[in-house]
Amino acid sequence: MRTEALEMTPSTSLSNWMGTLIGYVQSARPDLTNRQMALLLVVYLVDGPHTVRGLASKLKVSKPVVTRALNTLGALGYLRRQKDESDLRNIFVERTPQGTAFLDEFSGLIDRTDRAAARQ
């Protein structure tokens, strides 16, 4: 078995992403999983309406996976579920002011990391 360290040429994208993640970990914001963050970004960046079924299809995961992520994101106030009054089997997923504020802050963190990297 090989034990020597693998060398990797750092890419700008990975270095910037690392800087963003370190800043996020150091913030007071709750840790989100990659699935939760992907779900949140789809709801905020892709025109809706969004349903649990549609989000599961978009992310290529099961509806229970989306439901678990929505439970967490809903408890944080980042997303809200609303029943479709015309078809009670459908659940719409909607944006919230808290979710908008979170993503604005996260976007700012990415921008600051990118600017810091550009100065180097």
Residue spans for each PLM region:
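Canonical helix-turn-helix DNA-binding module
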Residues: 49-91
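Amphipathic alpha-helical dimerization/coiled-coil segments
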Residues: 21-24, 101-120
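N-terminal leader segment of winged-helix/HTH proteins
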Residues: 1-31
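N-terminal helix-turn-helix DNA-binding core of bacterial DNA-binding proteins
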Residues: 22-62
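Basic, amphipathic "hinge/linker" alpha-helix immediately C-terminal to the N-terminal HTH DNA-binding motif
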Residues: 85-104
